[in-house]
A protein has these predicted regions:
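A hydrophobic alpha-helical transmembrane-helix feature that marks the membrane cores
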Residues: 1-208
């Protein structure tokens, strides 16, 4: 076998390995989403958990800020565990921790949404829109083969600005409004493209 054939064989093996890694990654994502939905259903039907969370979030001006702060710290820990390439167990622990944190912080948000729209139409529409948006952006990132890692600094800057505005709105008491909501959607779209790009181009194949 000549050098060219060896190179082609190696490239093919790497492509197959990366494709298998991407498949395993999104299987784990699907499992995490199902776990989130099951846990969310349990939490929302357990008043002993739901009521304290809602009271903490909306009982005082700084309650929601405390929840966001706890989620940020917990999310950082979860990502640290999930990024551990030496321990599969640590990766699974990080994933599980993040699912639990997401489920907890969504409880007061869902309760609030149901209070405003008891028919559930708003929640259903938000779920459908989120699913379509995620699927579309993920498909773009996977098929375009473009590396979106350059977006990291912009996303970090946008995240810090958003967090600062949220803190100010809670402390001062002003409403952020529809423009801020739209900006958060744009930021979330950028994060989806960035993370999908990292899965394709940067992550080790053991980090599924």
């Amino acid at each position: 076998m000549d050098a060219y054939s060896l190179a082609q064989s190696g490239a093919g093996a790497r492509t197959a390995t990366r494709a298998d890694f991407i498949r395993r990654t999104y299987l784990h994502l699907a499992g995490a989403i199902l776990a989130f939905l099951a846990l969310e259903y349990y939490l929302l039907n357990t008043p002993a958990i739901t009521n304290p969370l809602v009271k903490l979030a909306f009982g005082s001006r700084y309650g929601w800020l405390g929840l966001i702060g706890g989620f940020a710290v917990g999310g950082w820990l979860a990502r640290s565990f999930a990024a551990n390439v030496k321990s599969t167990g640590a990766q699974y622990f990080g994933l599980a921790l993040y699912v639990v944190l997401e489920a907890l912080i969504f409880v007061p948000l869902i309760v609030l949404a149901v209070q405003y729209d008891k028919s559930g139409t708003t929640l259903k529409a938000a779920g459908i829109m989120t699913t379509m948006l995620f699927a579309g952006l993920t498909g773009i990132a996977l098929t375009s083969k473009r590396n979106f890692s350059f977006m990291r600094s912009y996303l970090m800057m946008g995240g810090f600005v958003a967090l600062g505005l949220i803190v100010l709105s809670i402390m001062i008491g002003f409403t952020l409004g529809i423009v801020f909501s739209g900006a958060m959607i744009v930021l979330a779209c950028g994060a989806i493209l960035y993370d999908t790009s990292r899965i394709m181009h940067e992550f080790d194949t053991s980090q599924h």
